């Protein structure tokens, strides 16, 4: 009873992919399942999303895990390869690679592969992280075209740095740069992430790369409301994180609650102790007042988050009982709200769920 539970609704996951495909019917879906499927389970997500056109993972280990469990769909490794041994595995296991630096090009030229490789040339249009500059990209593209180790045509991609910003100036500049530099290049193109998918319909080219929206979470957080209604109407949260009440206490006015005595009862009142803490991945920096959902009603967090427990104010739920489920985020309580309260983003909360949490799959 005292383990927190992450309930993964695989029906919602499939639904979200179908919505993405319906909204971009001319594009193929290269779905992002890196970082353990955004915390939802790498293999679980891949098996549920069998209708995806390709999977995107961060590193070769994630790709090999998918191949080992029988996933045969195209898999593209976003960070590519870094030595000859890895490159050989890419060929052996039919993995696609994002090419973003000259060292990778050199490895391709000097390594004898058993089969040719599917690659995507990453063009840095302003993210300033990975990729070849706009000025370098034509020469690299021409160099890759001559390689017998590479399947043709070569994929062409960029990554948007600021697509979740209501100010569109920089993102429009990135898109303009990408279209300009690739004008004379032949190959499938890919530009948008989840935020770009909604905000920049002109960039819905051959391939789209949905990530956080697959899991029913807005890429805009709670501050950018232009697409709020559309997202809430069409997409469903996949993960619901819950834990049970393990104790109920009646505290007196001015009693403090939790480490550091940071919160005191304003009056005589009931509180509940809930079996979840930062050891499970609940954010330690969530402040008093952060909402949880108990029997359909909001109750506020009180006091500091401990490793294994939190305390909540029961004044609005005086009939709560030990064993009742408390929803920390998910169905009925968007994780974006919790992230905002904790001063972080939903992505981080999802990815920080620990092994102590029990995962359950449902179809609902």
UniProtKB/Swiss-Prot annotation:
One of its GO terms (molecular function) is pyridoxal phosphate binding. It catalyses: L-alanine = D-alanine. Its cofactor is pyridoxal 5'-phosphate. InterPro entries: Ala_racemase (IPR000821), Ala_racemase/Decarboxylase_C (IPR009006), Ala_racemase_C (IPR011079), Ala_racemase_N (IPR001608), PLP-binding_barrel (IPR029066). The modification N6-(pyridoxal phosphate)lysine is found at residue 34. GO terms for cellular component: cytosol. Coiled coil: none annotated. GO terms for biological process: D-alanine biosynthetic process. Signal peptide: none annotated. Substrate binds at residues 129, 307. It comes from the Bacteria. Belongs to the alanine racemase family. NCBIfam families: alr. Catalyzes the interconversion of L-alanine and D-alanine. May also act on other amino acids. PANTHER family: ALANINE RACEMASE, ALANINE RACEMASE, BIOSYNTHETIC. This is Alanine racemase. The gene is alr.
């Amino acid at each position: 009873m005292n383990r927190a539970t992450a309930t993964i609704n695989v029906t919602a996951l499939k639904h979200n992919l179908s919505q993405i495909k319906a909204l971009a019917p001319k594009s193929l879906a290269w779905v992002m399942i890196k970082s353990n499927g955004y915390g939802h389970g790498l293999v679980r997500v891949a098996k549920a999303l069998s209708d995806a056109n390709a999977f995107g993972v961060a590193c070769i280990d994630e790709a090999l895990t998918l191949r080992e469990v029988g996933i045969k769909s195209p898999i593209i490794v976003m960070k590519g390869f870094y030595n000859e041994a890895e490159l050989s595995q890419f060929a052996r296991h039919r993995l696609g690679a994002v090419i973003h630096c000259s060292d990778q090009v050199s490895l391709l030229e000097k390594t004898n592969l058993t089969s040719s490789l599917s690659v995507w040339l990453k063009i840095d249009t302003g993210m300033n992280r990975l990729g070849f500059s706009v000025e370098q990209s034509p020469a690299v593209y021409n160099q890759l075209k001559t390689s017998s180790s590479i399947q043709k045509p070569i994929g062409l991609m960029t990554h948007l740095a600021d697509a979740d910003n209501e100010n569109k100036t920089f993102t429009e500049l990135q898109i303009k740069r990408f279209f300009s530099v690739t004008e004379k290049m032949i190959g499938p193109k890919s530009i948008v992430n989840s935020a770009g998918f909604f905000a920049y319909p002109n960039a819905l080219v051959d391939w789209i790369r949905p990530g956080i929206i697959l899991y029913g979470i807005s890429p805009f957080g709670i501050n950018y409301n232009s697409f709020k209604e559309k997202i809430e109407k069409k997409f469903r949260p996949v993960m619901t994180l819950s834990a049970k009440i393990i104790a109920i206490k009646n505290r007196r006015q001015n009693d403090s609650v939790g480490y550091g005595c940071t919160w005191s009862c304003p009056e005589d009142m009931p509180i509940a102790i809930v079996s979840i803490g930062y050891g499970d991945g609940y954010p330690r920096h969530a402040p008093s007042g952060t909402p949880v959902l108990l029997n359909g009603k909001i109750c506020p967090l009180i006091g500091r988050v401990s490793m294994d427990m939190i305390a909540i104010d029961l004044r609005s739920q005086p009939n709560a009982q030990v064993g009742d489920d408390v929803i920390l985020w998910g169905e009925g309580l968007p994780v974006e709200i919790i992230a905002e309260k904790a001063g972080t983003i939903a992505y981080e909360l999802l990815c920080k769920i620990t092994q102590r949490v029990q995962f359950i799959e449902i179809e609902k």
